[in-house]
Every structure is written in C-alpha cells, then in structure tokens.
C-alpha cells in the first residue's frame, strides 16, 4: 500500500546490506545512493530529496564507516504530477 501524499512515515533503512559489496572507500557515497533507491522503492516515489542532515549522518564517521542502519522520516508530496519523497532524520 503506497504512502498517501502528505502522510509521514518512519523507515529504518538497512545500510548494512551494501557494506560488504562495496570497497571500503566507496561506502558512504554508495550508502547515500542506496538510501535514495530504497526510499524510492518503498515510498513509490519518482524523486527522492535527502535533507543535508541525512547526508551528514551518513558521512559522520568518514567514507569507510557509514552507520549500519538509518532511521528516517519520509513525507511524500505530489509536485507537477510526480511523487516526491522528502527524507529527514527521525
């Protein structure tokens, strides 16, 4: 069941899934991309916008050690007929 526009939902994104598949020095950039893909799939959104705080949390311990999971709040809005998911820290 997709998220209704304007509804707030809290997700826990399992970043650990990609940590062993990516070289150590690429982990934080790949984690940011994974968060976008995961939210797009689960929120049924065509576009995903991450707040700067989410990116800072991913990079907090450097490129090699992103967190294993990330708790985020997602709000879906319809802009010009496209579903846009806005992601912030929960």
From Swiss-Prot:
One of its GO terms (molecular function) is structural constituent of ribosome. SMART domains: Ribosomal_L31e. One of its GO terms (cellular component) is ribosome. It comes from the Archaea. Gene3D superfamilies: 3.10.440.10. SUPFAM superfamilies: Ribosomal protein L31e (SSF54575). HAMAP family: Ribosomal_eL31. NCBIfam families: PRK01192.1-1. Belongs to the eukaryotic ribosomal protein eL31 family. This is Large ribosomal subunit protein eL31. It comes from Thermococcus gammatolerans (strain DSM 15229 / JCM 11827 / EJ3).
